Amino acid sequence: MANSGLQLLGYFLALGGWVGIIASTALPQWKQSSYAGDAIITAVGLYEGLWMSCASQSTGQVQCKLYDSLLALDGHIQSARALMVVAVLLGFVAMVLSVVGMKCTRVGDSNPTAKSRVAISGGALFLLAGLCTLTAVSWYATLVTQEFFNPSTPVNARYEFGPALFVGWASAGLAMLGGSFLCCTCPEPERANSIPQPYRSGPSTAAREPVVKLPASVKGPLGV
């Protein structure tokens, strides 16, 4: 019962992390315009993501444009795209395996050991999905930080962390935490099929004593 509760907790944590990974992948606010220091606050806020760039007007109107060319993008954007897509796919497979392997489902009840191993496999894939997300988000954030503190970057062209990065960090943490809980599920040891036999006492000592037969030529002391 304890393992079943731990599986449910891990599954819902990892599922929430996977949904957050999808949201982080789709959001265009991976980096946004910086207004720190001497930067002039303009009426237009710029956002950039993995798939598009957006401009937000002071009136609330937002205009977004998809990137025109795939090959013309920077290497870190292409790498982040690949890692996030892989994380989404791994999370989907992990979700299916976890549902099959959890004790609260009816699939594979005839083999509890194999069922637990399937749940552990799902947890491992959730861990990989969270690791891919963490790598992509942290790498992107590192480049944004380097560009921000680069003296050659104009003040009005500097960017800061966007909300999508924080969503990605939180989602990666949830996916890895939930995957860890699923991996902590220990398979049940196989029980021996043999039925214990009742104890039977051995034959008595008297029955084990050998019977000595005298030859016919030997007679007793009375000559009988």
From Swiss-Prot:
Tissue: Expressed in the corticomedullary axis of the TAL, specifically in the cortex and the outer stripe of outer medulla (OSOM) zone (at protein level). Expressed in peripheral nervous system, in Schwan cells (at protein level).
Transmembrane feature ranges: 8-28, 82-102, 118-138, 161-181
Function summary: Forms paracellular channels: coassembles with CLDN16 into tight junction strands with cation-selective channels through the strands, conveying epithelial permeability in a process known as paracellular tight junction permeability. Involved in the maintenance of ion gradients along the nephron. In the thick ascending limb (TAL) of Henle's loop, facilitates sodium paracellular permeability from the interstitial compartment to the lumen, contributing to the lumen-positive transepithelial potential that drives paracellular magnesium and calcium reabsorption.
Sequence ranges on the Cytoplasmic membrane side: 1-7, 103-117, 182-224
Organism: Mus musculus (Mouse)
Alphabetized PROSITE patterns for the sequence: CLAUDIN
Protein name: Claudin-19
Gene: Cldn19
InterPro entries: Claudin, Claudin_CS, PMP22/EMP/MP20/Claudin
UniProt effect for mutating T153Y: Abolishes interaction with Clostridium perfringens CPE
Catalytic activity of the protein: Mg(2+)(in) = Mg(2+)(out); Ca(2+)(in) = Ca(2+)(out); Na(+)(in) = Na(+)(out); K(+)(in) = K(+)(out)
The family this protein is said to belong to: Belongs to the claudin family.
